[in-house]
Regions:
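Active-site neighborhood of HAD-like aspartate-dependent phosphohydrolases
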Residues: 2-65
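Polytopic alpha-helical membrane proteins, predominantly small-molecule transporters/carriers
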Residues: 105-108, 118
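Metal-dependent phosphoesterase signature
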Residues: 61-95, 100-102
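Hydrophobic alpha-helical core bundles mediating ligand binding, dimerization, or RNAP-core interactions
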Residues: 39-43, 73-77, 115
Length: 215
């Protein structure tokens, strides 16, 4: 899991994709489910500066400090998985995609154990779930490319939906369509808003997005 990709400048797409999508790849926390994770609290407990990416920062810590911080992270993630709830409109949106023959996957910076526990609790089932235990983490595009290769499609045939810039940056680097899920928040205040091809405020109001994705 390398943080080097994150430091590279990502430019927004100037030319929108065309044609219907064959698959949609979702972020998990904050997009499909609300697990109440507070990364600012985690950073304070770990003694890390505000705003730094947790996983990449922990890679560069001394072994004893990294072990301590990982234990804090896992404790918060496990608590989040135990209280996770599906966000409004998500089930209906997934059902609509399924009815249209659109494949669905998840990519997350969570561990395999936590991702599986979260999705099981929320009764969400996906064909593929890629976690930090499987390979390079977003904003690296590896997981998106792996999913596309498994599906036998090119990234331009999929849309990536997430609530943070790492999701959007990974999608752009892979060559996928990108959708920032704003959850009703002012988009100008959200990291990645200037990069995303589309913005989505609510899964309950996704008709326009589906049309934009050729569905």
């Amino acid at each position: 899991m390398s943080g080097s990709t994150e430091r590279q400048r990502v430019k927004p797409r100037r030319e929108p994709h065309s044609g219907p999508v064959a698959g949609v790849i979702f972020d998990m926390d904050g997009t499909l489910v609300d697990s109440g994770l507070d990364f600012a609290v985690m950073r304070r407990e770990m003694g890390l500066p505000d705003g730094v990416p947790l996983l990449e920062t922990m890679e560069n810590l001394a072994e004893a400090e990294a072990i301590r911080c990982r234990a804090i992270l896992l404790r918060h993630e496990a608590a989040g998985a135990a209280r996770a709830v599906v966000l409004s409109g998500v089930r209906r949106f997934l059902d609509r995609l399924r009815g249209l023959g659109v494949r669905q996957a998840v990519f997350t910076r969570n561990s395999r154990e936590v991702a599986d526990a979260t999705l099981t609790r929320c009764r969400l089932d996906f064909e593929l779930v890629m976690t930090r235990d499987d390979g390079p983490i977003k904003p690296d595009p590896w997981a998106i490319r792996h999913i596309c290769a498994t599906w036998g499609v090119v990234p331009a045939q999929v849309a990536v939906i997430g609530d943070y810039r790492f999701d959007i940056e990974a999608g752009i680097r892979a060559g996928a369509r990108t959708v920032l899920f704003t959850r009703g928040r002012p988009s100008e205040s959200l990291p990645g808003a200037d990069l995303a091809e589309f913005h989505l405020a609510s899964f309950q109001q996704a008709d326009q997005l589906l049309r934009a994705l050729g569905l």
